[in-house]
UniProtKB/Swiss-Prot annotation:
PROSITE patterns: ABC_TM1
Bilayer disposition of the protein: Multi-pass membrane protein
The protein's name: Maltose/maltodextrin transport system permease protein MalG
Keyword Membrane set for record: yes
Assembly behavior: The complex is composed of two ATP-binding proteins (MalK), two transmembrane proteins (MalG and MalF) and a solute-binding protein (MalE).
Database matches in Gene3D superfamilies: MetI-like (1.10.3720.10)
Species for this entry: Salmonella typhimurium (strain LT2 / SGSC1412 / ATCC 700720)
Lineage: Bacteria, Pseudomonadati, Pseudomonadota, Gammaproteobacteria, Enterobacterales
Keywords assigned: Cell inner membrane, Cell membrane, Membrane, Sugar transport, Transmembrane, Transmembrane helix, Transport
Domain of life: Bacteria
A GO cellular-component term linked to this record: plasma membrane
Positions of transmembrane segments: 13-35, 89-111, 124-143, 153-175, 205-227, 258-280
Ranges for domain ABC transmembrane type-1: 85-281
GO annotation, biological process: maltodextrin transmembrane transport; maltose transport
Transmembrane helix in keyword set: yes
C-alpha cells in the first residue's frame, strides 16, 4: 500500500529544496560572475552574467600570449601568471607533504607514547595555533632575515623560507591525526610487535595504511591553506618572478589601473590545482571525514 505524505511534510520538503537551491545559487553566482568578467572585452567589473560578446584576450594574456588588436597594437602579457601558478603549486605541494610527515610522526608520539609534559605540550600547541599568523609577521621577517645570512635557501625572497614558515602551522593537524590514531586499536601494533616488527615497522606498515583517509584530509587542507595564503608569502617574497599566484594577483589591482578581466582569468586559473587535488583525493577525503577508524 502506497504511503501518502501529509501536506505539512510536503511543504517542509518544498521549503528545504528551495532553501538548498538558493544556497547553491548564492555559492555559484560569484564563480559564474568571475568567469563572465574574464570573458568580457575590456577590464570592467560590472556587466551582465552572460557577455554580449565573448573575448579570449584576458585568457591569452594569462596564459602568456600577446594579444594583437584590430588597430595593430600588441599587448604583451603584463605578468608571468603561469610562473606564479607553478610557484604556488610547488610551494603548496612541498608544504603539504612536509606537514603530513611532521604531523603524522608528532601525532603518533602523542597518541601511543608516554612522556612527561605530554598534556601540557598538546594544550600549548593548540593555544599557540589560535593566534593569527599576522601577529607574527614582524618576528618572521626578522627571523628569516637573520636565517638567510647563514642558510641562504631559507632566507628572505626564497621559496624555501616560505615553505619553512608554513611548516610551523601543524598544531591543528597533529590534534586531528592524533584523534584518528586513537580510534585504531593498539592491539594491531602489538600483534605486529609479537611477529617481530619494530615500532617503526608497526607504524609504517600497520598504522599508516589504516590512516590514509585522514592523511588525505590533512594533505588537502594543508595544500589549500598554502596555495591561498597571502600575508606571509607577500612579506617574505620580493621579486615578481618569485611570487605565488595569490600574491601576484594583487599586481592587477593598483590605484592607477584595475585590470579586472585579467584578474578574473588568473583567479579561475588559480582554482584549477585545488580542484584537481580534490578530484584525485575525493575517495580518501570522504572516508577521512566520515570514518572513525578500525575497531577490534
Amino acid at each position: 500500500m502506497a504511503m501518502v505524505q501529509p501536506k505539512s511534510q510536503k511543504l517542509r520538503l518544498l521549503i528545504t529544496h528551495l532553501g538548498l537551491l538558493i544556497f547553491i545559487a548564492a555559492i555559484m553566482f560569484p564563480l559564474l560572475m568571475v568567469i563572465a568578467i574574464s570573458l568580457r572585452e575590456g577590464n570592467f567589473a560590472t556587466g551582465s552574467l552572460i557577455p554580449d560578446k565573448i573575448s579570449w584576450e584576458h585568457w591569452r594574456l594569462a596564459l602568456g600570449f600577446s594579444v594583437e588588436h584590430a588597430d595593430g597594437r600588441v599587448t604583451p602579457p603584463p605578468f608571468p601568471v603561469l610562473l606564479w601558478l607553478w610557484n604556488s603549486v610547488k610551494i603548496a605541494g612541498i608544504t603539504a607533504i612536509g606537514i603530513v610527515a611532521l604531523s603524522t610522526t608528532c601525532a603518533y608520539a602523542f597518541a601511543r607514547m608516554r612522556f612527561p609534559g605530554k598534556a601540557t605540550l598538546l594544550k600549548g600547541m593548540l593555544i599557540f595555533q589560535m593566534f593569527p599568523a599576522v601577529l607574527s609577521l614582524v618576528a618572521l621577517y626578522a627571523l628569516f632575515d637573520r636565517l638567510g645570512q647563514y642558510i641562504p635557501f631559507i632566507g628572505l625572497n626564497t621559496h624555501g623560507g616560505v615553505i619553512f614558515a608554513y611548516l610551523g602551522g601543524i598544531a591543528l593537524h597533529v590534534w586531528t591525526i592524533k584523534g584518528y590514531f586513537e580510534t585504531i586499536d593498539s592491539s594491531l601494533e602489538e600483534a605486529a610487535a609479537l611477529d617481530g616488527a619494530t615500532p617503526w615497522q608497526a607504524f609504517r606498515l600497520v598504522l599508516l595504511p589504516l590512516s590514509v583517509p585522514i592523511l588525505a584530509v590533512v594533505f588537502i587542507l594543508s595544500f589549500i591553506a598554502a596555495i591561498t595564503e597571502v600575508p606571509v608569502a607577500s612579506l617574505l617574497l620580493r621579486d615578481v618572478d618569485s611570487y605565488t599566484l595569490a600574491v601576484g594577483m594583487q599586481q592587477y589591482l593598483n590605484p592607477q589601473n584595475y585590470l579586472w578581466g585579467d584578474f578574473a582569468a588568473a583567479a579561475v586559473l588559480s582554482a584549477i590545482p585545488i580542484t584537481l587535488v580534490f578530484l584525485l583525493a575525493q575517495r580518501w577525503l570522504v572516508n577521512g571525514l566520515t570514518a572513525g577508524g578500525v575497531k577490534g
